[in-house]
C-alpha cells in the first residue's frame, strides 16, 4: 500500500494565503510537509490560516511577506527558510497579476511587462535563486496556469499571454533541469471558485451558469486544485516532466454552442 508522507519535505507556495495557493499549502500540510506560504502586505489573516492547518493536524506553516517581483524579498524569504530547512523540495509558482484589458486601447506595454514580472518570471527566478541559496534545485517545480491562452475570456488578454509564456518556459526549464532530477510541470485549471475569479469576470457569472443549467458543478473548488498539485509531487507521477496538464472537470470539451443548444431544447 502506498502512503503519502511528506514530513521531511519543505514546500514553498507563492501567493499561498488564499484560493488555490492556500488550498495547495493545506494539501501538502495534510501530508505532513513543512509549508512556506508567501503573501503581500495586508493580504492574509494569519491566525485563520494557522487555524486551518491545525485543524488538519498539519505542521504550522511559515508565513512570509514577499513580493515575487523583488529579488531582495526573495533573498529574505530564502534566508527565513534556511533557518529551519536545508532546501526547498517543492516549489509551486502560483502568483498571477494582470490588468484587465476589455478593449485594445487598454493595451499598455508597461502593464504587460508588469504582468510578466508577476505571473511568469518568478517561476524561473525563484528556481534559480533556490539553487544559489541551497546548492540544489527543488525536486519538483509546478507552475499554475489556465486555459486562457487557448480559449477566449473577455478582458483576459494579458493573463492569457503571460500564461502562454509561462508554459513555454516550463517546458524548457524541464529540459535544463532533467539531469538535476527536477520535474517541472504546469497545471492548467479551469474555472475555480475564488475571489480573483469574481474580480476578473464579475459576481453575476454564477447566475449565468445557473440559467445555462450548469451551476456549481462547472467550478473547481480550490481544494481540487491543491490535490492535483500534490499528486504531481507525490512520486507516483515522476515519469512526467515538461508537461502541461488540464484539470477542469472536462468542461472545455463540452463548452460549445451545440451543447448550449441541447440544454436549451431540454428546458
Go through each PLM region and give its residues.
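Conserved glycine-rich Rossmann-like NAD(P)H-binding loop of the short-chain dehydrogenase/reductase
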Residues: 31-48
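Short C-terminal tail/terminal secondary-structure segment
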Residues: 2, 241-267
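Catalytic loop of short-chain dehydrogenase/reductase
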Residues: 97, 115, 137-179, 191-192
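Conserved mid-core segment of classical short-chain dehydrogenase/reductases
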Residues: 75, 96-115, 132, 155-158, ...
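Alpha-helical segment proximal to the catalytic Tyr-Lys
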Residues: 132, 175-176, 238
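Catalytic Tyr-X3-Lys loop
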Residues: 105-124, 142, 166
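C-terminal helical subdomain
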Residues: 186, 204-250
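Conserved glycine-rich cofactor-binding loop
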Residues: 17-19
Amino acid at each position: 500500500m502506498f502512503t503519502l508522507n511528506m514530513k521531511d519535505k519543505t514546500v514553498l507556495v507563492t501567493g499561498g494565503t488564499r484560493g488555490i495557493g492556500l488550498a495547495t499549502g493545506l494539501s501538502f500540510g495534510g501530508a505532513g510537509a513543512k509549508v512556506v506560504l508567501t503573501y503581500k502586505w495586508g493580504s492574509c489573516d494569519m491566525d485563520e490560516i494557522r487555524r486551518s492547518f491545525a485543524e488538519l493536524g498539519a505542521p504550522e506553516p511559515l508565513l512570509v511577506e514577499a513580493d515575487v517581483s523583488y529579488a531582495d524579498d526573495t533573498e529574505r524569504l530564502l534566508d527565513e527558510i534556511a533557518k529551519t530547512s536545508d532546501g526547498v523540495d517543492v516549489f509551486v509558482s502560483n502568483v498571477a497579476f494582470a490588468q484587465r484589458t476589455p478593449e485594445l486601447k487598454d493595451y499598455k506595454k508597461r502593464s504587460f511587462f508588469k504582468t510578466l514580472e508577476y505571473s511568469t518570471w518568478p517561476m524561473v527566478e525563484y528556481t534559480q535563486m533556490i539553487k544559489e541559496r541551497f546548492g540544489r534545485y527543488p525536486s519538483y517545480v509546478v507552475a499554475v496556469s489556465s486555459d486562457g491562452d487557448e480559449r477566449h475570456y473577455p478582458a483576459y488578454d494579458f493573463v492569457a499571454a503571460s500564461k502562454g509564456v509561462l508554459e513555454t518556459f516550463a517546458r524548457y526549464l524541464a529540459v535544463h533541469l532533467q539531469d538535476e532530477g527536477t520535474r517541472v510541470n504546469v497545471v492548467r485549471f479551469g474555472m475555480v471558485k475564488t475571489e480573483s475569479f469574481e474580480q476578473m469576470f464579475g459576481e453575476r457569472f454564477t447566475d449565468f451558469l445557473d440559467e445555462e443549467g450548469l451551476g456549481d458543478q462547472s467550478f473547481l473548488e480550490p481544494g481540487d486544485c491543491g490535490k492535483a498539485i500534490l499528486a504531481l509531487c507525490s512520486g507516483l507521477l515522476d515519469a512526467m516532466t515538461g508537461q502541461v496538464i488540464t484539470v477542469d472537470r472536462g468542461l472545455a470539451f463540452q463548452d460549445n454552442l451545440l451543447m448550449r443548444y441541447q440544454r436549451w431544447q431540454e428546458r
